[in-house]
């Protein structure tokens, strides 16, 4: 089970990323636009650097919804491998069954 502070930190990162999403996209488009002057592009780089670190989507980590475990996360279910297995064995995930050959 992940610490509550780690889960809260992840929620904070998601909120910040959503808050600054449009502004970050606009600045990144300005930076990559070669038709603009070098000075305008450099100003956009400096503005982007002022944003909070946690507002970057790449700082987010996928975590299990039930336990908060960051490793062995399965995107399809939003759970870690351990919780997917438990749910599958209980029959809580429709159409998922244990493989046998």
Curated annotation (Swiss-Prot):
Give the protein's function.
Answer: Binds 16S rRNA, required for the assembly of 30S particles and may also be responsible for determining the conformation of the 16S rRNA at the A site.
- Tell me which family the UniProt entry assigns to this protein: Belongs to the universal ribosomal protein uS14 family.
Record HAMAP family: Ribosomal_uS14_1 (MF_00537)
**Self-association state and partner proteins as the record states:** Part of the 30S ribosomal subunit. Contacts proteins S3 and S10.
Q: Which domain of life is it from?
A: Bacteria
Gene Ontology cellular component annotations, sorted alphabetically: cytoplasm; small ribosomal subunit
Tell me which UniProt keywords the record has, alphabetically.
Answer: Ribonucleoprotein, Ribosomal protein, RNA-binding, rRNA-binding
Q: What is this protein called?
A: Small ribosomal subunit protein uS14
Any one Pfam family match given in the protein's UniProt record, by short name:
Ribosomal_S14
Q: Which GO terms describe its biological process?
A: translation
Name one molecular function that GO assigns to this entry.
Answer: rRNA binding
Keyword Magnesium among record annotations: no
Q: Which residues cross the membrane?
A: none
